[in-house]
């Protein structure tokens, strides 16, 4: 259950960052509202996961999910570059998060 909470927390963190980007684009208050909800829910789920997972593992996986997710959202929806080097390093982050899960 803690891994489900952690994965959901990472996805919500990515959603919060995406809402921050949306707010910078069109300054609507709804983006701030969604940003706050996304980050609050993310921190809550992260804290639940950290009840049983080691802090270092939980935090590394949480930030990894947010980093990879944010980069992929940027590539897929905001026209950010998708060159081979960028994809390689995104894959390294993802592989590291999976590795931490396997040893925890």
From Swiss-Prot:
The chain crosses the membrane at residues 3-23, 31-51, 58-78, 84-104. One of its GO terms (biological process) is monoatomic ion transport. It is found in: Cell membrane. The keyword DNA repair does not apply. InterPro entries: Small_drug/metabolite_transptr (IPR000390), Small_multidrug_res (IPR045324). GO terms for molecular function: transmembrane transporter activity. Keywords: Cell membrane, Ion transport, Membrane, Transmembrane, Transmembrane helix, Transport. Pfam families: Multi_Drug_Res. One of its GO terms (cellular component) is plasma membrane. The keyword rRNA-binding does not apply. It is a multi-pass membrane protein. Probably involved in guanidinium transport. PANTHER family: GUANIDINIUM EXPORTER, SMR FAMILY PROTON-DEPENDENT DRUG EFFLUX TRANSPORTER SUGE. Belongs to the drug/metabolite transporter (DMT) superfamily. Small multidrug resistance (SMR) (TC 2.A.7.1) family. YkkC/YkkD subfamily. The efflux pump is composed of GdnC and GdnD. This is Probable guanidinium efflux system subunit GdnD. It comes from Bacillus licheniformis (strain ATCC 14580 / DSM 13 / JCM 2505 / CCUG 7422 / NBRC 12200 / NCIMB 9375 / NCTC 10341 / NRRL NRS-1264 / Gibson 46).
């Amino acid at each position: 259950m803690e891994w489900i909470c952690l994965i959901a927390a990472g996805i919500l963190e990515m959603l919060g960052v995406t809402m921050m980007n949306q707010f910078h684009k069109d300054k609507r208050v709804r983006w701030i509202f969604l940003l706050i909800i996304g980050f609050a829910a993310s921190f809550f789920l992260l804290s639940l996961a950290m009840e049983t997972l080691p802090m270092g593992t939980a935090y590394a996986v949480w930030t990894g999910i947010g980093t990879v997710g944010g980069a992929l959202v940027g590539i897929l929806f905001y026209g950010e570059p998708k060159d081979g080097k960028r994809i390689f390093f995104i894959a390294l982050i993802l592989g590291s998060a999976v590795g931490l899960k396997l040893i925890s």
